[in-house]
């Protein structure tokens, strides 16, 4: 009898131990890079290396790719706020209507156009509670993580709500710790010698001044490094809480101003780059070092085996004018055309890597396409959160089957973009008021101002040099119908003509 009781007790302890092991939730880190081009890395996301892969040094992106899966067709919006609002809400930008970048309350950031009256979009961003005009109300996945036992940390750029609105503060979206996140989508300077945009009395000299880094003022610490050190301190605290953590490491790099990160600048000067391009390269490598520092922390603290890392860019690399990059412009994302703000691939295709120990096969590559709003259901599925309810419909589709190589959620799926806006102060290929659809190999861009439609076969023409709309009218018609139907279904916005006051036709209303 005694032996039977001892055996039963031992089995009970074993079963309980196994159950606890099975219930252990993974830590999750989302490492989002600002304005990073598809080619701003030594890791080739194309089927061949380019001069940019040879130019830049990102050893930790390569390290992460060896541990996980690269995605060669990861898409986002061409501008920061729309991407970040889609990430947080799981909604396409056409639905949430934060279609351009946000900053000041009730103030549009649109540029001017002689032809179009631009729509009254959600200039105040997103919110989790109603009561603020020109916002989209939705529950963030971070709030759902927190409700399900995660310690949630925000570090760096937020940029999903205007000044003096609920969306300005990441803590209103489920983050328990907020490091430097506020309304601004850029930064005044990366330099501690300039107090990251504050005067000697501590007053911000710009709306873009980075808050919360006073400890690093006048220390010679580049902003990317300061944010990394603060993130590591937050992880040290999180480890003591004995609960899984979610870290949103959202760097301001590689956003303008293109300041010199002197830890790496001279290396690139010695490679023969100009001051501007060497500074740009130094921002990239500083970001990569941050990734490596976080990976090192995970290994040192025994958390690497239970931590998922997702790496993503928020929009295309900065390739236009304003004096930040050297000529020739619009080529810096080669083989993709153009960059940030453009409907062409250079504006919307992002570098992406996911490492998930014991789930994702190391050193793999996925050529299926996905969209930024897919992160919402994916991260919740990774965390084992299945039963959740949100006031907003979720447009995103989990890409966990791609990670596990058990299915293809992109099969038969269309991706959609709507940018009924003008990116102020910038001009170049595809930088205009547009709506776009990607379906299989085909991509259709509709220009609101002119009614022009461009059709590209992306696998055959990744640079979008050959518009084949005239030779494939049937495909143009089909994609126009799909795009028009989708935009109507989500109550998307569109401009109107100044000359008549009439709304611009939907793409399926124009031959």
Language model features by range: what are they?
Residues 222, 226-239, 266-307:
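A long, amphipathic alpha-helix that forms part
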Residues 177, 182-185, 318-345, 360-364, ...:
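C-terminal cap/loop subdomain of S1 sulfatases and analogous C-terminal strand-loop tails that border
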Residues 22-26, 33, 38, 70, ...:
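Long, internal low-complexity/basic segments
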Residues 166-174, 256-263, 296-359, 371, ...:
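Histidine-centered active-site microenvironments of extracellular/periplasmic hydrolases
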Residues 49-84, 90-95, 151-153, 173-182, ...:
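Short, structured active-site-proximal loop/turn typified by the sulfatase FGly-forming signature C/S-X-P-X-R
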Residues 52-58, 75-79, 110, 128-139, ...:
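A short beta-strand-to-alpha-helix junction
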Residues 45, 70-91, 99-106, 154-166, ...:
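Short, solvent-exposed turn/loop segments enriched in Gly/Ser/Thr/Pro and often Arg
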Residues 103-151, 158-243, 251-260, 278-281:
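Formylglycine-dependent
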């Amino acid at each position: 009898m005694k032996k039977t009781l001892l055996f039963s007790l031992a089995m009970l302890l074993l079963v309980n131990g196994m159950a606890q092991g099975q219930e252990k939730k993974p830590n999750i880190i989302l490492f989002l890079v600002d304005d990073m081009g598809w080619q701003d890395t030594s890791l080739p996301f194309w089927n061949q290396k380019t001069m940019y892969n040879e130019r830049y040094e990102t050893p930790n992106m390569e390290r992460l790719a060896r541990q996980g899966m690269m995605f060669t067709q990861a898409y986002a919006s061409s501008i920061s706020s729309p991407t970040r609002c889609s990430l947080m809400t799981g909604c396409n930008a056409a639905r949430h209507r934060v279609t351009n970048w946000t900053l000041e309350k009730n103030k549009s950031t649109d540029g001017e156009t002689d032809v179009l009256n631009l729509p009254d979009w959600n200039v105040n961003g997103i919110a989790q509670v109603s009561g603020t005009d020109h916002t989209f109300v939705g529950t963030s996945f971070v709030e759902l993580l927190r409700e399900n036992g995660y310690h949630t940390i925000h570090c760096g750029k937020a940029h999903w709500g205007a000044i003096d609105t609920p969306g300005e503060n990441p803590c209103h979206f489920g983050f328990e710790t907020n490091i430097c996140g506020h309304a601004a989508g850029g930064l005044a300077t990366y330099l501690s010698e300039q107090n990251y945009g504050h005067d000697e009395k501590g007053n911000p000299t710009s709306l873009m001044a980075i808050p919360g880094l006073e400890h690093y003022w006048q220390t010679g610490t580049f902003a990317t490094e300061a944010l990394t050190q603060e993130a590591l301190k937050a992880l040290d605290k999180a480890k003591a809480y004995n609960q899984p953590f979610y870290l949103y490491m959202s760097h301001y790099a590689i956003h303008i101003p293109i300041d010199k990160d002197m830890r790496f600048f001279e290396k690139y000067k010695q490679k023969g780059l100009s001051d501007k391009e060497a500074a740009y390269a130094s921002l990239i490598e500083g970001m990569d070092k941050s990734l490596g520092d976080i990976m090192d922390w995970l290994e040192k603290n025994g958390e690497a085996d239970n931590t998922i890392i997702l790496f993503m860019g928020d929009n295309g690399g900065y390739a236009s004018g304003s004096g930040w990059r050297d000529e020739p412009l619009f080529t810096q994302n080669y083989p993709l055309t153009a960059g940030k703000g453009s409907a062409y691939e250079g504006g919307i295709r992002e570098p992406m890597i996911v490492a998930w120990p014991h789930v994702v096969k190391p050193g793999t590559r996925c050529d299926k396409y996905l969209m930024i709003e897919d992160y919402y259901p994916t991260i919740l599925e990774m965390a084992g959160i299945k039963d959740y309810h949100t006031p907003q419909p979720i447009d995103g589709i989990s890409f966990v089957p791609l990670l596990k190589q058990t299915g293809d959620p992109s099969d038969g799926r269309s991706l959609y973009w709507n940018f009924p806006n003008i990116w102020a102060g910038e001009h170049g290929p595809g930088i205009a008021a547009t709506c776009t659809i990607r379906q299989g190999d085909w991509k259709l861009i509709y220009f609101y101002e002119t009614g022009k439609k461009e059709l590209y076969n992306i696998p055959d023409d990744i640079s979008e040099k050959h518009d084949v709309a005239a030779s494939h009218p049937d495909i143009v018609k089909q994609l126009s119908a799909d795009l028009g139907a989708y935009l109507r279904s989500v109550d998307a916005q569109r401009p109107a003509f100044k000359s008549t006051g009439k709304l611009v036709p939907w793409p399926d209303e124009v031959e």
